[in-house]
Amino acid sequence: MKDKVFEKPIEKKFEFDQAVASVFDDMLSRSVPFYDEVRHLVISLILAEQREGMKVLDLGASTAKFLLDLHSKMEAGMQLKGIDNSPAMLERAEQKCQAFGASIDLALADMMEYSYEEEDIIVANYTLQFIRPMQRIELVKRLYESLNEGGMFIFSEKVVFEDKRLDKEMIDIYYDYKKTQGYSEYEIAQKREALENVLIPFTIEENIRMCRDAGFRNISTIFQWANFVTFVAKK
């Protein structure tokens, strides 16, 4: 279904409700530059590490698109889990997993309150940016503690730049990109207003520092397009 959420005047801040869940896959593919390519990149990285019984947790699993893609490509019997705090998203995720016959453990949970078990890989695709900065830092510390030695935390984020002129230029370039994906200036402005104080991005340096302060020692960026970046932090 095509994303038309912001064609009408907004009445509330952005949230992952039924209206968003129904068009979320389209929203991601048209709103996040190279979303499909990054998803495939992260899956390839996980598959390079795959082994029987390896545990993979997706934070903010939404409609389970990432986990289903990973499930369809894996050869070893990995244990796939996903959590999301949106009932509407989880409902769609469960429907899709059932339709594809995929054995994926899904849970309705808040990332800040979830009881993390030992994991080998944790993935967060454009998820941390919706968590308040101080809570975000505490969450990453908990993720580090839950990872087994040698484990990986792979996350993608929208970022800001300390250079204000460069930051504005990157935002303008991104909005031009959205226009090429069929979004009108009105829709772009509506979504920008809805996300105000909901999506709070860090700089690249702040994301790296957050991981380092949590205990990660090997932190790399493996993809960047303008103000969209994918990081890998190893324990």
From Swiss-Prot:
Keywords per UniProt: S-adenosyl-L-methionine, Transferase
Domain of life the protein comes from: Bacteria
Annotated EC: 2.1.3.-
InterPro entries, A to Z: CmoA (IPR005271), Methyltransf_25 (IPR041698), SAM-dependent_MTases_sf (IPR029063)
One Pfam assignment: Methyltransf_25
Binding, S-adenosyl-L-methionine: 35, 60-62, 84-85, 125, 192
Molecular function, one GO term: carboxyl- or carbamoyltransferase activity
Function, as annotated: Catalyzes the conversion of S-adenosyl-L-methionine (SAM) to carboxy-S-adenosyl-L-methionine (Cx-SAM).
Protein name as it appears in the record: Carboxy-S-adenosyl-L-methionine synthase
Lineage: Bacteria, Pseudomonadati, Campylobacterota, Epsilonproteobacteria, Campylobacterales
